[in-house]
């Protein structure tokens, strides 16, 4: 991973410099856009963009239909991780320990009722850049996941939110606990947590 980072460092610096002009133009245009929104909706309450700051959003766990005859379920499982495994692509290499746990179905208390291991889920929460790592709570205030991305259709959400298409991608807390407990063997950390089932 370190060698990979070093190999792209120069190119990343070049791209960052090349994007600087675009970013400046976008920031100026966005300022005018927000000014226009505030003027147009001056009688209504306005909410700020997250722009890498704290923000509260809400939604529901939900799949979506990005186009005709295509439906993405709201839940992914470890089955999907194994289906995507590719030993020639570092992003899709599955560690032997995780494979062994999967083959043995050794998911402990973290598995779904049907015996599968949950990995991630999608929700209608409206997120933006800087929201990765944000806690995701249920209606009882219990941690159920950690936001880490948004779907491809959600990238334009900084301009306009489209509830039928945009989804936050959230790692299921049961998968995180499974990795801590079964994969990493660090179950002692769980003693510091209050787990609710």
What do the PLM-derived regions correspond to, one by one?
Residues 1-197:
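Terminal presequence/propeptide segments associated with secretion/organelle targeting
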């Amino acid at each position: 991973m370190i060698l990979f980072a070093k190999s792209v460092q120069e190119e990343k610096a070049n791209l960052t410099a090349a994007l600087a002009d675009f970013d400046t133009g976008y920031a100026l245009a966005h300022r005018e856009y927000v000014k226009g929104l505030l003027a147009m909706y001056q009688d209504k309450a306005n909410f700020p963009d997250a722009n890498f700051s704290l923000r509260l959003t809400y939604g529901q766990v939900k799949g979506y239909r990005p186009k005709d005859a295509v439906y993405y379920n709201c839940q992914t499982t470890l089955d999907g991780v194994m289906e995507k495994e590719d030993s020639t692509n570092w992003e899709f290499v599955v560690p032997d320990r995780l494979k062994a746990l999967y083959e043995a179905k050794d998911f402990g208390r973290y598995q779904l009722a049907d015996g599968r291991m949950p990995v991630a889920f999608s929700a209608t929460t409206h997120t933006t850049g800087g929201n990765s790592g944000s806690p995701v709570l249920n209606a009882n205030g219990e941690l159920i996941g950690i936001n880490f991305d948004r779907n491809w259709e959600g990238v334009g959400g900084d301009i306009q939110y489209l509830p039928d298409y945009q989804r936050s991608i959230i790692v299921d807390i049961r998968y995180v606990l499974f990795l801590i407990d079964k994969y990493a063997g660090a179950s002692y950390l769980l003693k510091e947590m209050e787990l609710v089932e």
